[in-house]
Amino acid sequence: MTSNEAIVRAAYRTADGDVQDLEGWRNAFTEDGVFNNIAAGESYTGDRLGDVVTYMATLMPDVHRELLRVHESGNLVVVELLIEGTFLGPLPTPAGPVPPTGTKVSIPTADFFYLRDGKIETFNCYVSMNIMLDQMGVYPDFASAVKPVTGPGAQR
């Protein structure tokens, strides 16, 4: 295992539900490091770097990242993984909290870590949000998005 891979693996371990070492997580990043949660369209820096770690542990206290494949090329480490845990929520949504179901979830994810001088400079996380929501029993309300077509040229 190379040093950059070891750094990434150690960072993952700090974020597991049975560890929750937020200081260790933050210390894995450069001073100007950023965590981009691509699926949610959110970015975290500084003291907020641990926000998603805390959120995931609240959602799934037994959260664990099962690393399937790890590839390193220079200062880039790419990881294919499953984020696994038990949905003990609640899951906050714009419509209100979704109560926990106690179901086990296994969320396919791809993570890209860009390192500088032995620390994480940028972490881009691509979580399969649709699969996560489906496993939690949260389904899109397509009917509310469908609008009847009216006016000239409308199909009947």
Language-model-derived ranges and their functions:
Residues 1-156:
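C-terminal and inter-domain tail/linker signature
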